[in-house]
Regions:
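Metallocofactor- and cofactor-centric catalytic cores in central/energy metabolism, strongly enriched
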Residues: 2-412, 419-422, 427-498
Length: 498
């Protein structure tokens, strides 16, 4: 059997990953040993290469992904039926810093972006309607419909309302999270102009909310409180939107250094190829971007469980290490406070694709942030302050996490997927497939195919093409989610609803 039928990711691994469906009785040559497969094993799934006793750790990516539930023989298909997570509660961690040099040259690349008055740069120039409360979602959608009909979006990239269910009937942390995310959307550089649309009586009081925006551009961000309008709020809203649209229409793209790019890193519908193709590809891009002076952000904190020490030891200093420890343990406490196990993460789709435990998922997931040092740690709803690689507190849920990334200031999100997903958040959400079958079957969803990495294409060649693609999207080329009109936001909720 040819070597290309499987891959051993790390020399220390006790499993190999099948690159194609393999049949019971087939043989593979691994480290000078002939191993006979004991079961039919799907592509992306793991085959044990040594006999192990019950309780023995199984290694992949060079780290434990769980332990054997029973004695296992070489050639066995390793999956959730015979592999158990090692994850439990919160842990105490020790800072053992790792200083790894990237040694990536600066290339002085540029993209065509929109430079805002405050110096931030957008990759889109859109007019947005942001409801302060879900009660006015319908009004917001109607205003967008009217403005689109009247203008045809001529001279700008899009007109959109970001509807949500919150802004009232919330308390403490949930209420503050909603306000922070809505604030972040209003201040996002991809918006050329924003109408903040309020009902008037909601918990998220309009005057207080506008104060949260700080020193904002009063010409480009306007407030309309619908309960204060005598008569037709649509007529009043259109007056404001016409003015905002006229201003945004004057904005033009200009050459901007790639150091101004801020990119979110996300995965969803992951499979056994995620940690082999798409995530390492995104990791290579992330390192390249950081070396250019740009910024990348990794979130999905629960999907760091099992790989967290790798990130902790890459923190630039002890203060960042301590923040990362809190990031991890706070999310574990969140799980435990709801009576949920911290390791119960892989979805049915993950398992069908070859991911058996949360450690298995996490070690693949964190490939997306490459090898760069961690230079910043953000709480949910915080806006970026530091260039380089940042970690952001948010759950693994695709819509919530992608919204959180965009809210922090990312102009676009890189989203790797092995199973496929059409959704997008309020910034361009590029889908990178882990396998070529997905790219072939869902070209309307997928922006870039990383599956070529197991088909003979060299990483350096694919990274070069990937960089070109990202710069093209940053310069105005539509991501597939934009072309399809699949754009939405989702805000994290933890507490009661009144």
């Amino acid at each position: 059997m040819e070597q290309s039928s499987f891959i051993k990711i790390n020399p220390a691994d006790s499993v190999v990953v099948c690159l194609r469906p393999m049949k019971k009785g087939e043989t593979i040559e691994v480290d000078g040993k002939t191993i006979t497969l004991l079961q039919d094993t799907p592509a992306g799934h793991k085959v044990l290469i040594n006999d192990v006793a019950e309780g023995t750790d199984i290694l992949k990516y060079g780290y434990p992904i769980g332990h054997a539930k029973t004695d296992l023989k070489a050639g066995e298909w390793v999956n959730e039926n015979n592999l158990k997570t090692n994850l439990a509660g919160t842990l105490e961690y020790t800072y053992n810093p790792v200083d790894e040099q990237l040694n990536i040259a600066k290339e002085n690349r540029t993209f065509k972006g929109y430079v805002r008055k405050n110096g931030e740069v957008g990759v889109r120039n859109e007019v947005w309607v942001v409801p302060t409360v879900g009660c006015v979602n319908g009004v917001a959608e109607k205003l967008v419909e009217l403005l689109k009909k009247e203008t045809g979006c001529e001279g700008i990239d899009a007109i959109h309302a970001w509807h949500h269910n919150f802004g009232c009937s919330q308390l403490s942390g949930d209420h503050e999270n909603t306000r922070k995310v809505l604030r972040d959307i209003c201040l996002h550089p991809n918006a050329g102009a924003v109408l903040v649309l309020s009902l008037g009586c909601e918990n998220n009081q309009p005057d207080d909310f506008m104060k949260m925006l700080g020193d904002y551009d009063h010409d480009r961000i306007k407030l309309l409180v619908t309960q204060k309008v005598e008569g037709d709020e649509l007529e009043e809203g259109m007056k404001i939107l016409r003015n905002l649209y006229a201003q945004a229409k004057e904005d033009k793209r200009e050459d901007v250094p790639v150091s101004k790019l801020r990119v979110g890193l996300k995965c969803g519908g992951s499979d056994g190829f995620s940690g082999i193709t798409a995530n390492p590809l995104v990791g290579e891009f992330s390192d390249w971007l950081v070396a250019q002076g740009g910024t990348s952000i990794l979130t999905e904190v629960p999907e760091m469980f099992g790989a967290e020490t790798i990130l902790m030891n890459r923190c630039e200093n002890k203060e960042l290490f301590d923040k990362t420890v809190h990031l991890i343990n706070d999310f574990k406490e969140y799980f435990l406070s709801h009576g949920e196990p911290v390791g119960e993460n892989p979805s049915p789709g993950n398992k069908a694709g070859g991911i058996s435990t949360l450690e298995d998922k996490a070690l693949g997931c964190t490939q997306k942030c490459g090898r760069a040092p961690v230079s910043g740690v953000l709480q949910y709803g915080d806006r970026l302050e530091t260039t380089g690689l940042n970690l952001l507190s948010a759950p693994g849920n695709d819509l919530v996490a992608a919204t959180a990334l965009a809210s922090s200031g990312c102009q676009l999100v890189l989203f790797t997927t092995g199973r496929g997903t059409p959704f997008g958040t309020f910034v361009p959400t590029m889908k990178i497939s882990t396998n070529s079958n997905l790219a072939k079957n869902k070209p309307n969803w997928i922006d870039f195919n990383a599956g070529a990495l197991v088909e003979g294409v060299e990483m350096k060649d694919l990274v070069s093409k990937f960089i070109d693609k990202i710069i093209a999207v940053a310069s105005g080329e539509e991501a597939r989610n934009e072309y399809n009109g699949y754009r939405e936001i989702s805000i994290f909720k933890n507490g009661v609803t009144l």
